[in-house]
Amino acid sequence: MSMSPKHTTPFSVSDILSPLEESYKKVGMEGGGLGAPLAAYRQGQAAPPAAAMQQHAVGHHGAVTAAYHMTAAGVPQLSHSAVGGYCNGNLGNMSELPPYQDTMRNSASGPGWYGANPDPRFPAISRFMGPASGMNMSGMGGLGSLGDVSKNMAPLPSAPRRKRRVLFSQAQVYELERRFKQQKYLSAPEREHLASMIHLTPTQVKIWFQNHRYKMKRQAKDKAAQQQLQQDSGGGGGGGGGAGCPQQQQAQQQSPRRVAVPVLVKDGKPCQAGAPAPGAASLQGHAQQQAQQQAQAAQAAAAAISVGSGGAGLGAHPGHQPGSAGQSPDLAHHAASPAALQGQVSSLSHLNSSGSDYGAMSCSTLLYGRTW
């Protein structure tokens, strides 16, 4: 969108602004107040209505430009040499700058701008801001001497340095450790005596004993923790039986004592034929008792038969008793092994039957002899 009007006019914007620019230049050179620019501005406002229409057509751009020129009218022009020295960092030339003058406040139209009755809050601010007199920039020349003043100032006292650590000799450490093994806590006289012996102060001995006691406690605690960790890891590696290890040991202690027993019979055959086992001796004695009882019963039966047959039978039957009694050692020999018990019983029954048959036979022969 073009800012120029669509229809042509007999004058231009430059014709309207040229009187203002000339007045601004005069004010800048003379350093005067705002009276002349305002008069020139009023003359510009007194233009024909066509000029007002042209200014309205220009819009806010023209208003901002006019306001900028009006504000800049009250600012005095600075010399390029003074500003150049300030920009280059040369503070020595600050005294050459002209003093600042508040022409807006000092002009005749100042009360119209600021008002005759200012806000009651402003005095509190002006008290901190100071008077509105011109600010003298010549005092800035003293800034160059700040470096010299800072050099002449004494340095601030720093924090006290930490005392250097004292290293004990090997002989001192050996004596301290030897005394620590004997006695972990020392009284004041003992501390002084030990310190005088190893050329230390009682405070150093006291601190060394404190540190050494703490060191021993920490080592003992670390060692116990390491042993506990090893036990836990060992129990976990054994299939999670770490918690049951004490219970297993207690059960083994409460269980009866185990005794090694040799094998006597295997598959019906004695393992040791030459030396009878301790259990076999009792079995052998029991078998002998049974054999003796059976022999006595056989003898009683034979005696009854002999008494019934006659006196001859009494002489003949005792001759056979040793034979029957003599068979008991054989029975005892057969009873040496538990496997022969069944055969022993059968042999005893056979012995009884054979004895009775033999008695009957003897009686018959005796009868036959009598008949002869």
From Swiss-Prot:
Major localisation: nucleus
Molecular functions (GO terms): core promoter sequence-specific DNA binding; DNA binding; DNA-binding transcription activator activity, RNA polymerase II-specific; DNA-binding transcription factor activity; DNA-binding transcription factor activity, RNA polymerase II-specific; enzyme binding; identical protein binding; intronic transcription regulatory region sequence-specific DNA binding
SUPFAM superfamilies for the chain: Homeodomain-like
Domain of life assignment: Eukaryota
Modifications the protein undergoes after translation, according to the UniProt entry: Phosphorylated on serine residues by STK3/MST2.
DNA-binding region(s) from the entry: 161-220
Subcellular location: Nucleus
Family: Belongs to the NK-2 homeobox family.
Function, in words: Transcription factor that binds and activates the promoter of thyroid specific genes such as thyroglobulin, thyroperoxidase, and thyrotropin receptor. Crucial in the maintenance of the thyroid differentiation phenotype. May play a role in lung development and surfactant homeostasis. Forms a regulatory loop with GRHL2 that coordinates lung epithelial cell morphogenesis and differentiation. Activates the transcription of GNRHR and plays a role in enhancing the circadian oscillation of its gene expression. Represses the transcription of the circadian transcriptional repressor NR1D1.
Quaternary structure annotation from Swiss-Prot or TrEMBL: Interacts with WWTR1.
Name of the protein in its database record: Homeobox protein Nkx-2.1
Organism encoding this protein: Rattus norvegicus
Species lineage: Eukaryota, Metazoa, Chordata, Craniata, Vertebrata
